[in-house]
């Protein structure tokens, strides 16, 4: 290479080594060859906390409503009902469900996370952190199927939650290991940091309880209550009659009650009774357990962390679960017989009712965006919203004054 060419190349590189980009501004200055950074070159500062600015200046998608499904059976009714014409693939989504689906103008989008807490947290993190999506004003509808507590709902029923309670973060002993020493225990679960099932956990991880916007939940319930739900099959109707509870025997309806999160798929009277009590304990008597799910607390933990930095608005999240089956057996069946050999008429009503009950609030958001939903003021929360740590501010109406973090 000629010296003149080498000099030209070096000049070009020198010019390019000083550059700036927006949000945050980064400046890289060229140092002379063999120059050493001495102590006097380093400015004195008392702030050793590295920080960055937040925002997505290059985002091209700003959906008004986002539907969150967990697996294909929950996703497919939405794909059939909505005019999703765009498929968007971003890094970090489930390898089973790698696409986000959006309508023509990207006003409504849908994501499928994969089942379980890890899949939900991973996929929602990938979505909310992706620079292509500006989700600061987006409303999220978590819409999935769940097991139902027959005291409050039935097969095909629709539930909208104010609280999501994670029941798996506990000690656990096998029946053989506790029934002689603690015959009064309901189950082998014991809250962390205690040796008593009726004592609030002594230490927490922070994901045990989430509370969402009650006013927005109530608006979704108001709209969903005006539509005609799918009542299910003849088999559903016959199976409902095996229960003594009025709610279990009745036709599907929309109810306000709360969701449990557990990776472990449980059933039976023993665990249902314990987790119902645990729900009351964790929420200071405020929550009413009626649906069993596997993802909600994981999704809400991601939303909480991102809301703290302004990337999503936690006030704009709704949790809807439709009931595919009962979480405990009818009196005529054992838990084992019910779980492995039942014929309850199928889950088609719960899948259809995801769209039937979820569409009204989605359409309301889109149709009244400019007048109501963009600002969010009309349905802004009056209750506490967030986690047990008060990450988003305010004072939780559950928990206790202090506990150890684990």
UniProtKB/Swiss-Prot annotation:
Recorded superkingdom: Eukaryota
Transmembrane annotation, as ranges: none
Entry annotated with the keyword Transport: yes
Database matches in Pfam families: NUP
GO BP terms, alphabetized: nucleoside metabolic process; nucleoside transport
GO MF annotations, alphabetized: catalytic activity; nucleoside:proton symporter activity
Keywords for this protein: Signal, Transport
PTM comment: Predicted to be a substrate for cleavage by KEX2.
Leader peptide range in chain numbering: 1-22
Activation and inhibition: Mammalian nucleoside transport inhibitors dipyridamole and NBMPR inhibit adenosine transport by NUP.
Family: Belongs to the NUP family.
Protein name, as recorded: Purine nucleoside permease
Organism in which the protein naturally occurs: Candida albicans (strain SC5314 / ATCC MYA-2876)
């Amino acid at each position: 290479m000629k010296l003149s060419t080498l000099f030209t190349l070096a000049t070009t590189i020198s010019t390019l080594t000083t550059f700036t980009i927006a949000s945050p501004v980064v400046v890289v200055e060229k140092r002379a060859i063999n120059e050493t950074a001495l102590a006097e070159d380093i400015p004195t500062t008392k702030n050793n906390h590295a920080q960055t600015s937040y925002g997505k200046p290059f985002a091209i998608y700003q959906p008004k409503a986002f539907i969150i499904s967990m697996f294909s059976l929950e996703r497919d009714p939405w794909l059939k009902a909505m005019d999703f014409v765009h498929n968007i693939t971003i890094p970090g989504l489930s390898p089973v469900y790698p696409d986000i689906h959006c309508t023509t103008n990207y006003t409504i989008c849908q994501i499928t996370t994969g089942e379980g807490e890890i899949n939900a947290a991973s996929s929602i993190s990938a979505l909310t952190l992706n620079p292509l999506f500006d989700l600061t004003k987006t409303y999220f509808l978590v819409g999935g199927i769940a097991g139902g507590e027959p005291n409050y709902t039935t097969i095909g029923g629709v539930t909208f939650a104010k609280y999501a309670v994670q029941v798996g973060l506990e000690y656990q002993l096998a029946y053989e290991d506790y029934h002689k020493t603690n015959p009064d225990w309901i189950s082998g679960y014991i809250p962390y940091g205690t040796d008593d099932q009726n004592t609030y956990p002594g230490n927490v991880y922070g994901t045990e309880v989430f509370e969402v916007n009650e006013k927005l939940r109530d608006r979704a319930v108001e709209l969903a209550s005006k539509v005609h739900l799918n009542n299910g099959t003849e088999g559903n109707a016959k199976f409902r009659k095996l229960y003594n509870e009025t709610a279990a025997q009745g036709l599907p309806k929309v109810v306000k009650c709360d969701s449990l999160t557990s990776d472990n798929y449980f059933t039976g009277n023993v665990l249902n009774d314990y987790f119902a009590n645990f729900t009351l304990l964790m929420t200071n008597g405020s929550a009413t357990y009626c649906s069993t799910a596997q993802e909600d607390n994981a999704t809400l933990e991601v939303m909480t962390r991102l809301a703290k930095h302004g990337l999503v608005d936690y006030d704009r999240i709704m949790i809807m679960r439709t009931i595919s089956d009962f979480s405990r057996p009818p009196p005529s069946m054992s838990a084992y017989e019910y779980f492995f050999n039942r014929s309850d008429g199928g889950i088609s009503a719960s899948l259809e009712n995801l769209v039937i009950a979820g569409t009204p609030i989605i359409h309301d958001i889109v149709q009244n965006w400019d007048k109501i939903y963009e600002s969010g003021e009309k349905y802004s929360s009056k209750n506490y919203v967030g986690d047990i740590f008060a990450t988003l501010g305010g004072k939780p109406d559950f928990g206790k004054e202090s506990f150890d973090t684990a």
